[in-house]
Structures are given as structure tokens and as C-alpha cells.
């Protein structure tokens, strides 16, 4: 895997990407996404906050400590969702090799499951089983809801969604981190994986949202005036 790096203001062009729940307390909510089936949701405020904390921490940590399964932008999101919902036992922490002590509570209303955790909607059929895999387009269509075209509306853990019709794999996602526990220099960090291209497997990158708005290629600026920036989306797992 290419070495992860913190991206300065003069950014290189972003890469492209290919892009039985056992516990009763996990409830479902309809109508959060147009044409989407019933959605998983953590309605408990404490669990929602715990999930968001873990999700942001794990996505951010993947920049500093590469994860084998994270090979594109959607894989980063799947990894962070899945591992946020696990019990974070001493053995889990040992294997995760996080750069710091998390100090976060676990999500108590988590799905049952061991290594295999089908968590994602992949169809508009409400009876369709959940899946372990969802690409970027599927994550947005069935597992997230639109928040705003204004990137300033993003909360930690929200997704920035781009669609680049001219590319072979047009859908690309970034995760808004906000303040980073690994870098105290700003409060608007974003992380993402470029995905593979003809030059190699791609890499994790980290950049400030403010710098991204001045990206040398206008199509990657998270601005309402940029038609390739679809907007800010929020995982339906959290309110």
C-alpha cells in the first residue's frame, strides 16, 4: 500500500474508487432516504454518540495505521462502521494497534455477529437481507441521507459525496473528521482513501476542509457551485 500522507493546500488530483440482527434495541426507521428500504438506526442518544466517536476515531486512525481491508473510499467506511459496532475488548484493542488509547464507551445496542456482520442495505426491497459489502453508490443510496449542499453543515462522521461522470468509477466519498485526536492543528479535517488507479493501489489521505475548498481542480471542491459535489450525507445508522 502506498504510504499515507497529510495533504497540503496544493493537492494532487484525487484518485478514483471502484466504488439476523440479534439485539432487539436496534430499531428501524422508514423514509429517511428517497426510494430506500427500512434503515438500521441507533436511536439511543448515548449509543449514537458512542458510534460516532468510534467511527471518526477509526477512520482517522486508518490514515496513521494502514488497514489491510481498506482499499478504497467505500472500504474505509465499511471498516469504520463494522469495527465501531464491535465490543472493544482487550484482544480487539491489541489487534487494532490504535496509535492512542480510545477512551470511548462501546455501543451497547449493537448487532449480533462475530467476524461476519451484514450491516448494509443493498436493495430497495425491504425484505432483502443486509450485506457485508456496499460500494460507494450503494452506501449513499441506501445507507445514508442527504444533509446539505453546504459542506459547513457537516458533523464529525458525515460523508462528503462526489460524483464524477467522466470517470470509470464516478462515485467517491470522504469522511469529515472535524477535530482530530491525532493532530490538534485544526478542527476541520477530512480523511479518505483514493482507491486504486493505473499507478498503484492508492493511499489514505488527510486534508483540511478549508484547503479542499481551494483544490487546484475545481471539480473536487466541496462547494455548492460545483456540480460534481453532490453534498453532505449522514449515515442512517445515527439520527
Give the location of each predicted region:
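Surface-exposed flexible segments
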Residues: 6, 173-180, 207-215
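N-terminal secretory signal peptides that target proteins for export/translocation
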Residues: 1-2
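Long alpha-helical scaffolds
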Residues: 5-6, 59
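...with weaker cross-activation on analogous glycine-rich loops/strands in unrelated enzymes
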Residues: 100-199
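Bacterial N-terminal signal peptides
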Residues: 8-22
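Low-complexity, Gly/Ser/Thr/Pro-rich intrinsically disordered linker/tail segments
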Residues: 187-239
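Signal peptide processing junction and immediate N-terminal pro/mature segment
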Residues: 20-30
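N-terminal capping segments
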Residues: 28-131
Amino acid at each position: 500500500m502506498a504510504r499515507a500522507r497529510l495533504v497540503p493546500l496544493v493537492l494532487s488530483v484525487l484518485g478514483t474508487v471502484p466504488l439476523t440482527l440479534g439485539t432487539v434495541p436496534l430499531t428501524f426507521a422508514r423514509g429517511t432516504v428517497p426510494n430506500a428500504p427500512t434503515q438500521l438506526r441507533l436511536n439511543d442518544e448515548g449509543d449514537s454518540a458512542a458510534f460516532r466517536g468510534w467511527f471518526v476515531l477509526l477512520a482517522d486512525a486508518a490514515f496513521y495505521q494502514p488497514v489491510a481491508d481498506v482499499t478504497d473510499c467505500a472500504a474505509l467506511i465499511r471498516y469504520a462502521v463494522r469495527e465501531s459496532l464491535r465490543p472493544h475488548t482487550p484482544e480487539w484493542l491489541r489487534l487494532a494497534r490504535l496509535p492512542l488509547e480510545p477512551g470511548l464507551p462501546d455501543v451497547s445496542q449493537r448487532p449480533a455477529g462475530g467476524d461476519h456482520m451484514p450491516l448494509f442495505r443493498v436493495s430497495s426491497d425491504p425484505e432483502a437481507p443486509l450485506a457485508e459489502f456496499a460500494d460507494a453508490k450503494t452506501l449513499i443510496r441506501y445507507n445514508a441521507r442527504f444533509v446539505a449542499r453546504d459542506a459547513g453543515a457537516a458533523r464529525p462522521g458525515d460523508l462528503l459525496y462526489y460524483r464524477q461522470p467522466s470517470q470509470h468509477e464516478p462515485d467517491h466519498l470522504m469522511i469529515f473528521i472535524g477535530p482530530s485526536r491525532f493532530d490538534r492543528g485544526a478542527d476541520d479535517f477530512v480523511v479518505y482513501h483514493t482507491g486504486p488507479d493505473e499507478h498503484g493501489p492508492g493511499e489514505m489521505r488527510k486534508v483540511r476542509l478549508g484547503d479542499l475548498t481551494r483544490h487546484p481542480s475545481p471539480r473536487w471542491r466541496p462547494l455548492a457551485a460545483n456540480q460534481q459535489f453532490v453534498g453532505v450525507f449522514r449515515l442512517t445508522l445515527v439520527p
